[in-house]
C-alpha cells in the first residue's frame, strides 16, 4: 500500500512539471523563461545579428509568448515573440554580443519586435522564419527622463552627411595607416549644448596610405576586407568655424566558417555586408538593405528619411517555414482556447522577465 501511495505522489509531482499538449490547439505553451524557450530565443537573436547588413547588433530583452508545435517525423518548432534592444556594437564589430552594452534610454534607445520560428532537432536550434521591425523610443519618453538629451537625427540630413565627411577627412589627414572609406552612416544626433552634430559611421580600410592619397577613387578595398567604426562630433564655434573630434577603431578580419544545419532547417546565408566601394549614404541616393529569403539575399531600398536601420528591411517574414524533409510545419490561425484544464497542470508564465528596460 505504501508503495502505491509513493508511486501516486511521484506521478502527481511529474504532472506538475510537465508541459501538456493542448489537445484542441495542437501545441503546448511552456513558460517564457523556460530554459529551452530561452535557448530558442537566443538562437533567434544570434541569427538576426549574423544576417543584419547594417546598423547595430540587438540583444534579447523579453520573451513575450511561445507556442511549441510538434514536427513530424522528428523535432519541434518554437513559435516565439520576442523584444530586443539595440546595443552599441555595430554589426561589423566582432565583439561577442555578451560584451556589448545596451544603448540606454537617455541615448535614445531602439527596440525590436520579432516573430520567429525556431526548429529544435537533436538538441540543436535552427531558425526557420523571421519577421521583425524596430523603432526608436518616443521623443516624449526620452524627454521625460532627460529633457536636454539629444534625439536621433535623420541620417540623410545635410548637416549629418557634412559631419561624417568632415570627421572622416580629418581622421584620414592625421592617420599614418590605411586610407579609410565610408561604408555607412549608422547614427546621428543634434546636440544642443555645445551646438554640435554627433555621428557614428562604419568604414573600410583600403590599399592606399592615408597621407599619400591624391585621388581617393583609385583606392581599393583590401583583398581580405577590414572594417572599422568611427565616432565623431562637429562643434560649431561661437566665432565661426568648426571644431572636429573623431576616433576610429579598426576591427580584426574574421573568417566566415559555414555552420552545419540540422535536417529541415534553412542554410544560413552569409552575412550581407555593405560594399564600401559603392555609393555612400546621402540625401540624393539612399543605400539598399537586404532581405534574408532562405539561402538568398534580395535587395530592398531603404526609406530616404530615416534615423535608424529598421529590422523589417531585412526580416520581412517572406521566408517559408516548410522544412525540406518530414511533414511540413505551418503556423496559421489557431483555435481560440483557454488554458488546458488539466488537474495539477502548470500555470503559464508569459510574458517573461525584462532583462534591461521596457520602452
Swiss-Prot record:
Disulfide bonds join 32-350, 89-100, 114-132, 146-149, 208-219, 230-248. InterPro entries: Cystatin_dom, Cystatin_Fetuin_A, Cystatin_sf, Kininogen_Fetuin_HRG, Prot_inh_fetuin_CS. GO terms for molecular function: cysteine-type endopeptidase inhibitor activity; endopeptidase inhibitor activity. Liver and bone. Its main location: secreted. The keyword Disulfide bond applies. Residues 27-133, 144-256 form the Cystatin fetuin-A-type domain. Coiled coil: none annotated. GO terms for cellular component: extracellular matrix; extracellular membrane-bounded organelle; extracellular region; extracellular space; plasma membrane; vesicle. Residues 257-285 are annotated as: Disordered. Residues 1-18 form the signal peptide. Keywords: Disulfide bond, Glycoprotein, Mineral balance, Phosphoprotein, Repeat, Secreted, Signal. Residues 276-285 have a biased composition (Low complexity). It is found in: Secreted. Transmembrane segments: none annotated. GO terms for biological process: acute-phase response; negative regulation of bone mineralization; positive regulation of phagocytosis; regulation of inflammatory response. The modification Phosphothreonine is found at residue 314. SUPFAM superfamilies: Cystatin/monellin. The modification Phosphoserine is found at residues 134-135, 138, 316, 320, 323, 325. It comes from the Eukaryota. Glycans are attached at residues 99, 156, 176, 271, 280, 282, 296, 334, 341. Promotes endocytosis, possesses opsonic properties and influences the mineral phase of bone. Suggested to have lymphocyte stimulating properties, lipid binding capability and to bind thyroid hormone. PANTHER family: ALPHA-2-HS-GLYCOPROTEIN, FETUIN. Belongs to the fetuin family. This is Alpha-2-HS-glycoprotein. It comes from Bos taurus (Bovine). The lineage of its organism: Eukaryota, Metazoa, Chordata, Craniata, Vertebrata.
